[in-house]
Amino acid sequence: FVKHGYQVEVYPTQQRLDAKEKVIHFAYQYDMIVCSGGDGTLNEVISGLMELPERPVLGYIPAGSTNDFAQGIRLPKSMIEAASVAVNGMQISVDIGGFGKKKFVYIAAFGAFTDVSYMTPQEMKNILGHPAYIIEAVTKLTSLRTYHMSVSYENGNVEGEFLYGMVTNSISVGGFKGIT
C-alpha cells in the first residue's frame, strides 16, 4: 500500500462489532478502508459502511477460517495478491441484503447451527481452521429445535416449522459448497 502512495493505519479489532463501530466513527477520514479478516469481520465493516451517507472505497484481504465470500467473488487466496487487487482498484459490485434494519453481505440465517461461528472459540479457529466449526456444530446436535416462521416473497407465502433458513449471496456457507 505504501508503495502505491497510501498512508497506512492499522487497527486490530478487539471484540465483536468493534469493526462496525470503528467504521461508523472514522470512515469519513479515509479514501479507502481495507478489511483483512474473515467473513464475519467483512460483514461488520460493510454493516458500518452502510450506515454512512458517503462511503470510502472498500478493499478486502481474506484472512479468516473459511473465506466463503472471498471465494464467491473470486478474490485470490494469497493475502499479497488480494492486497494487490485492493490497491489496483479492481472494483466489483455486490448485493447488500437487508434483514429487518440490519444489513448483510454474506448471509442472514436463523435456526440450527447459526450460532456456531460466534460460539467457536477464536483459539480453536486459529489452530484448526474450518474443522473447528464442525466440532462446535456437533456439540449442538442434541439441542436442535424448530422455529415457526412465515416467509413472504414476491409470488406467495410459506408458513411452517423450520429447522434452518438462510438468505445468502455466496456460493458456499461455512466452507460447504453446493448448499446454497
Language model segments and positions:
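Short glycine-/acidic-enriched loop or helix-start segments at secondary-structure transitions
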Residues: E44-I46, A70-Q71, F176-K177
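Short Gly/Thr/Asp-enriched flexible loops that form oxyanion-binding sites at enzyme active sites
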Residues: T41-P53
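Catalytic core of DAGKc-family lipid kinases
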Residues: Y11-T13, E51-V167
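Internal helical hairpin/lid segments
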Residues: M166-T180
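A short acidic Gly-Thr/Ser loop motif
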Residues: G37-G38, G64
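A generic local structural motif
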Residues: A19-K22, I46, I92, E136, ...
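Glycine-rich nucleotide phosphate-binding loop and flanking beta-alpha elements
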Residues: G40-L42, N67, V173
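ATP/NTP phosphate-donor binding region
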Residues: F1-S36, N43
